[in-house]
Amino acid sequence: VTQADVGSALANLKIPGVGSLSQSTICRFESLTLSHNNMIALKPILQAWLEEAEGAQREKMNKPELFNGGEKKRKRTSIAAPEKRSLEAYFAVQPRPSSEKIAAIAEKLDLKKNVV
């Protein structure tokens, strides 16, 4: 989460008299370069944001996923040497095969079409 994200998220807390804060204000709070009075004023606001953010993260971790959506990172595909040589030979002959040809190559090599 960036400092700008924190500043923007503060507006979502709906604390009376508190809007969003600039990235530079958050930076100065972190580096302890704000005045003492400003630090005292901002601490409960930032504490409220932190508690809400941590609560949302805990809830997200405890909630079972109905489906594994966009956050799951795809693993890197590794192709064995024989399949790699076959693919290189196919693409040397035809650098831009049609979708049907790619599907046929994938089936022949027992690979997924999106891997080919």
Swiss-Prot record:
SMART domains: POU
One Pfam family it belongs to: Pou
GO CC, any one term: cytoplasm
Region annotated Disordered, chain positions: 56-79
Disulfide bonds: none
Record's keyword terms, sorted: Cytoplasm, Developmental protein, DNA-binding, Homeobox, Nucleus, Transcription, Transcription regulation
Domain POU-specific: 1-54
Annotated region of DNA binding: 72-116
Main location: nucleus
Keyword Transcription: yes
Family: Belongs to the POU transcription factor family. Class-4 subfamily.
Role: Multifunctional transcription factor with different regions mediating its different effects. Acts by binding (via its C-terminal domain) to sequences related to the consensus octamer motif 5'-ATGCAAAT-3' in the regulatory regions of its target genes. Regulates the expression of specific genes involved in differentiation and survival within a subset of neuronal lineages. It has been shown that activation of some of these genes requires its N-terminal domain, maybe through a neuronal-specific cofactor.
PANTHER family: POU DOMAIN, POU DOMAIN, CLASS 4, TRANSCRIPTION FACTOR 1
Protein name: POU domain, class 4, transcription factor 1
Organism whose genome encodes this protein: Gallus gallus
